[in-house]
Amino acid sequence: MFDRINILKQKGYSPDLILDIGAHHGNWTYSMLQIYSNCEYKLFEAIDYTELNRYNNIPNITRYNAVLNNKIEEIPWYEMRNTGDSMFKEKTYHFDNCNIITKTTNTLNNLLVIPESIKNIFIKIDCQGAEIPILQGASNLLDKTDFILLEIPLFGQYNENVPSFLEHIKYMDSIGFIPYDITDNHYINNFNMQLDVIFINKLHPFNIVVNELLMKK
């Protein structure tokens, strides 16, 4: 994954703000800091893992203990304290006897006020099927967002009631984003069940550059 993101940097892309949504223990942010060390980071995680305390006193990193959604409401939360925790129950045996907790959700629109100084946002969402609801609650951020990295289903259904691959593509198109790159394939029992896909804002200059480069001799 990070080799693909590093190529973005080599092409001249540098975000002002990176949102790590579904931060878990913060390992994704740690790897991103090796690429973009100076930008602002905001980490969102439903569980207050002690592993995230390493970011407590870093000026350009802010943590949020929140379950993100498209509205503020109480929802059933399926929790085993691992990467499968979600409002959409994982369909593996690991969650056969999981704890069901009532949690109150929040939205990015409610939690964040983006200052004028922030012009370029990179969003990563890995939330076990909640990607579309989270983006529905983030409409105020999208005009300044260049790239959105999502984990989306491809074949089969890993979580209950999650939109399909095609529904994700159509939704992203409806909010002004198209596929840019595939950074990872997640094979389970030799089936390619999930993809990590970077979507690009349709108005980003790379949409013009890609075709201009085709014409160069």
Go through each PLM region and give its residues.
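Phosphate/nucleotide-binding beta-alpha loop and adjacent structural elements of enzyme active sites
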Residues: M1-K217
